[in-house]
Amino acid sequence: MPMKVLDMFCGMSAFRTAAELIGGFSFIGHCDNDPTAIAAYRTLYQTEGEYFCNDARAVNTDEIPDFDLLVGGFPCVAFSAAGARRAFDDPRGTLFFELSRILEAKHPAY
């Protein structure tokens, strides 16, 4: 049975592409706020019927199907030398807390 995966901050599908190459994974949903990235993601993969949200802060955990694994490459520019290093003063710097909120609500196996 494939491991069910929720792909947060999915961008253009790096995690999904790797998982597809490895095999044994089934994606139940994805989330990203970049329309261009989502368009590319949906061009590469059949996502009809998957859970989708374009804002991690708006994810309603009651609407997400159960999953085994959450993956997510949350934005790091708030902490990076490539950014202004505003850390938690930058709204992007708090997005990883959304992963924690989802994990606490859903209790996936991994």
Region roles according to the model:
Residues 1-110:
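Conserved active-site and SAM-binding loop architecture
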